[in-house]
Amino acid sequence: MNEMLYYDLKDASGVAPGLAMQISRELGRRIVAGHYKEDALVEDEGKLSQRFGVSKSVIREGVKLLVSKGLLEVKRGSGTRVRRRASWALLDDDVLAWHLSVDTKPIFLRQLLDMRQMMEPKAAGWAAQHGTDAQHADIEAAQIRMEEESHSIEDFVVADALFHRAILRAANNEILLSMEGVIFSALLSSIRLTNRDPRENASSIPFHRKVL
């Protein structure tokens, strides 16, 4: 659910992915999950074509997408290899989304939360200073929705994420907005680990009210 919610928040879920994108996402998830280890070789085009039931050209396009995101490298004569994590485009929307489809490593979650704690207080301040009346109304509407959805874990997660998105967008800072994926990923990862009981939802609402 978290991966698809991430795409929803990024307004990308309405675009149906083509075959090459579907292949890149499936391979990307497996790489992020560690099924393919760093420096390990990935099966050749023929084997991947048979496994996924698509043409070799589709496999090539899917691999190219992963090369562009830093997850794979292709060398003539030695095959396709998984690159070291330090080379991955970790701020890429797909890479962030794929982390939400697997068990998040504690160190990566901590790094996401560190970034969130650094960015969100500033975002709230800028939203107060630079946000329009309509944007402030969006924040208030999202907070009200949180109260209305507090009985449901999944619906509350959506409402909470929309609240934070409204604040980020009200800050009217293009650089900050380009990094909203980090906030979404940190938020969804932490909620998945800590918000397992609907009764816990109500306890977080007063903290969100303070932003208003």
Where are these predicted regions, by residue range?
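Short linear motifs at protein or domain termini
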Residues: 1-119, 125
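Short helix-capping and inter-helix turn/linker motifs at the boundaries of alpha-helical repeat units
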Residues: 18, 201-202
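Conserved amphipathic alpha-helical segments that form helical-bundle/coiled-coil interaction surfaces
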Residues: 112-193, 202-210
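Membrane-interface catalytic loops of GT-C/OST-like multi-pass glycosylation enzymes that act
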Residues: 197
